[in-house]
Design a protein with these regions (language model features):
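Residue preferences within the helical output face of two-component receiver
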Residues: 4, 57-58, 148
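Basic, amphipathic DNA-recognition helix from helix-turn-helix-like DNA-binding domains
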Residues: 32, 36, 41-102
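Receiver (REC) domain active-site loop signature in two-component systems and cognate sites
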Residues: 22
């Protein structure tokens, strides 16, 4: 954990695979610390397989959670998927003429990858950011859970309702005054 935080201070990293159970600084604390300054994809790879552990990992900013034992080919596929999405959205080669999107008091500066609500900066994970950007770019269009998943993860949606719902809930908690009566994100 501590080593990951230190490496990120000195080097450019495109993706992190983080274990939860580490000495001195566990993966939860390390992920929280990393999220303060970095928006890179984080995959938690852990022996902790309870639903509560997975939900905690996603709640604190991880973009994915894989339990041990795991299929190495699945891990490679997930890494490629996260990197593809991160690079596509982070690429300076693909720029639109207007990189700032607004809906009421919500503003997304896609050049800086920043989200503000009524002038206050909001920290989102890369997946949360990508979901919000997709929905704001296509205001008024209705997306199904499967369509959101397929647009963000670039893979077929099979039994992913809860994954997308958890991310939507987290976005609402961060951008809405009252998440139960959303102004911006209505699903």
């Amino acid at each position: 954990g501590i080593e990951a935080v230190e490496i990120l201070k000195k080097e450019s990293v495109d993706l992190l695979i983080m274990d939860i159970m580490m000495p001195r600084m566990d993966g939860i604390r390390a992920t929280l610390k990393i999220r303060e300054k970095h928006n890179i994809p984080i995959i938690i790879l852990s022996a902790k397989s309870e639903d509560a552990d997975k939900i905690l990992g996603l709640n604190i900013g991880a973009d994915d959670y894989i339990t041990k034992p795991f299929n190495p080919l699945e891990l490679v596929a997930r890494v490629k998927s996260h990197l593809r999405r991160y690079m596509q959205l982070g690429s300076t080669a693909i720029k639109e003429s207007e990189a700032i999107y607004t809906v009421g008091g919500l503003a997304i500066n896609d050049d800086l990858k920043e989200v503000t609500v009524d002038g206050e900066q909001v920290k989102l994970t890369p997946i949360e950011y990508n979901i919000l950007l997709l929905l704001v770019k296509h205001q008024g269009k209705v997306f199904s859970i499967d369509q959101i998943y397929e647009n963000i993860w670039n893979e077929n949606a099979v039994g992913v309702d809860n994954t997308v719902a958890v991310h939507i809930r987290h976005i609402r908690e961060k951008i809405e005054i009252n998440p139960k009566e959303p102004r911006y994100l209505k699903v």
